[in-house]
Amino acid sequence: MEEGGDFDNYYGADNQSECEYTDWKSSGALIPAIYMLVFLLGTTGNGLVLWTVFRSSREKRRSADIFIASLAVADLTFVVTLPLWATYTYRDYDWPFGTFFCKLSSYLIFVNMYASVFCLTGLSFDRYLAIVRPVANARLRLRVSGAVATAVLWVLAALLAMPVMVLRTTGDLENTTKVQCYMDYSMVATVSSEWAWEVGLGVSSTTVGFVVPFTIMLTCYFFIAQTIAGHFRKERIEGLRKRRRLLSIIVVLVVTFALCWMPYHLVKTLYMLGSLLHWPCDFDLFLMNIFPYCTCISYVNSCLNPFLYAFFDPRFRQACTSMLCCGQSRCAGTSHSSSGEKSASYSSGHSQGPGPNMGKGGEQMHEKSIPYSQETLVVD
């Protein structure tokens, strides 16, 4: 396979060298334009999420807020590398930034992939505890703080992405003046066994970075939906609107994650398995040509997360409004009176402010532990 393919931005595959790819063309300015759009939206959106979380007082933050902030950090760390990849793609896969940035930017891609999905899984589990098991798991949620959990997730993500840092390098493409950023397995494998390393790393990253976390998220949201539906069956008719709203948001969160990442992992896995299954060259070429677009779709997730996990919350929107019209007199009152409380815990599971149902330290008293009352996404 030609080393200029976008697959080689990640693995440097060469498992179907018997096929001819002379008809393959790069995507010109389209893919770089998408990368830069994701860069602009991702830096703005994730920066706004971090600003909203950390402007609140520490005692008002809950574990879900830490997961939200960690997710934003992962996405922000990744999107700042996109100008490098946009340049690389625009130059028809000619890397001008040297070996160090080849290693670092590639490493950050995979750290982001693992850290993001782990944070989403942690957030899903946090919602599960808050809605399905609010009383029985209260002590667990207090013992294992969001900060400790996210620290463990980040360490795990950094370790899982380490093969990319070690094996990534740059080299001249044969018979051209182009410099490629690719995975070099020669330091750990013979030529005949490189495909095994490639397939092993590719399949394992899909399993650990998508299949297992997505299964956990689906399980959490299944029990959340079941609990919400069971509760609202006891409510009056007007409660049906809240049920539909919450359940639809849950569906949007899960489906969006799947739509963004499933094409990437599916196409990547199919291509990697080509060494074993010997796909026809036409199908192999098809996989290689659509992979750059699947990659773009997965990257878009890094700029959608702020909207999906924060902008659905009216309290977060209030905080954004307070910031955007910070210098205007018409917003001064709102900014001083409500932004501190309303932006303190915009994430799901812990966003109810002090009130008649709050105990010491702002902990929720369980008046039968109404599940939906702990879910910000149903606030009118």
From Swiss-Prot:
Write the protein's name: Apelin receptor
Q: Which residues does the entry place in the Extracellular compartment?
A: 1-30, 87-99, 165-198, 271-289
Task: Name the principal localization, coarsely classed.
Answer: membrane
Briefly state the protein's biological role: G protein-coupled receptor for peptide hormones apelin (APLN) and apelin receptor early endogenous ligand (APELA/ELA), that plays a role in the regulation of normal cardiovascular function and fluid homeostasis. When acting as apelin receptor, activates both G(i) protein pathway that inhibits adenylate cyclase activity, and the beta-arrestin pathway that promotes internalization of the receptor. APLNR/APJ also functions as mechanoreceptor that is activated by pathological stimuli in a G-protein-independent fashion to induce beta-arrestin signaling, hence eliciting cardiac hypertrophy.
What mutagenesis or variant effect is reported for Y88A? Decreased APELA potency. No change in APLN/apelin-13 potency
**Resulting phenotype, S116A:** Small decrease in G(i) signaling after APLN/apelin-13 induction. Decreased beta-arresting signaling after APLN/apelin-13 induction
Record-level GO BP terms: adenylate cyclase-inhibiting G protein-coupled receptor signaling pathway; adult heart development; angiogenesis; aorta development; apelin receptor signaling pathway; atrioventricular valve development; blood vessel development; coronary vasculature development
Its quaternary organisation is:
Homodimer; dimerization inhibits APLNR-mediated G protein and beta-arrestin signaling pathways compared to monomeric APLNR.
